[in-house]
Amino acid sequence: MRIGIDARFFGPVGKGLGRYVERLVENLEKLDSQNEYIIFLRKENWDYYTPKVSNFKKVLADYPWYSLKEQIMMPIVIGREKLDLVHFPHFNIPIFCPKKFVATIHDLILLQFPTPRATTLGPLFYKIKYFGYRIVIGLGLRRAKKIITVSECTKKELVKFFKINPEKVEVTYEACDGVEYGQLKMPEKKHLAKFGITKPYLLYVGNAYPHKNLEGFLKIFSKLNLDCQLVLVGREDYFYKRMKEDIRGKTLERDVIFTDFVSEAILADLYRNARLYIFPSFVEGFGLPGLEAMSYGLPLAASDSSCLPEIYGDAAIYFDPRNEEEMIEKIKFVWTDELTRQNLIKLGLERVKRYSWENLAVKTLQIYQNVGKN
């Protein structure tokens, strides 16, 4: 078969989605020497990927995500490459794709948590974007030969929202990068001073979109009455800037640290030195940073909503993200109770072993082969 992968999100430019595409391609290169693969990239990530084997080739498809140009030009490029199958790793599926395709849907956050606060667009344009999203994803999912989700929770939501046959949907769990499980390096504190970290700290890694509930967490942070700091790791964008403005001049400002984007080495040190990882989201598709925290031996306090209990199992303490008192109680408990902390660390290091990028690639390849036969 000649298989195309829309890898325009490949690498750091695509954040979590970029990592998914990157790890999928890396592992398919190791697993499959029979099929030919065409990896579609944009100029901004063109140099980030170099095929390591002869049956993989990269092709430029420099069309912006979620654009009209993408809808028009991607079908032309796909047709030109004479593909048997295409994998779209996100919901921005060209609705006139001329070939059989599978699609990965990581979450349905725009449907589950619609809010104009999640965009810099005005209310009217947000509504247009919302309805455009529903049309594109609805048409794409109906035409897809198979749909991949990264959790059973997202699969159930997909079936419910779009009335899709559950047999059409396969789950392939993601995995975390990082340290060798059970072989944790000693933490280094050389990077902490540069950010003004002077106390034990709670850690969060990711964006600050409204569904992440960071604004809600900031409301209860000072009520924890713990002599600690809150370290928020994520590229400074409109949403993080808005949070900074919201706390400017308030007492908690001195104990909330925004690191902006950091390198992998610095991020590893921030994980290793933290006392607790917090994940207060209202809704998620997988919750990868929580697994990363576990892999570094960091206890986790997480929301009990959406997919998080499915992914973390008994290796986390859970709270209702809409209940301030419960959030405070659970976070203080895992912060102070050493027996619980050590148990969570042990369970977390075991939990991450369930998830593997190789397993994801194996199952994805099986999906390609099954679709190709039919």
Regions found by a protein language model. Give the residues of each.
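Carbohydrate transferase catalytic cores enriched for Leloir-type hexosyltransferases
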Residues: 1-374
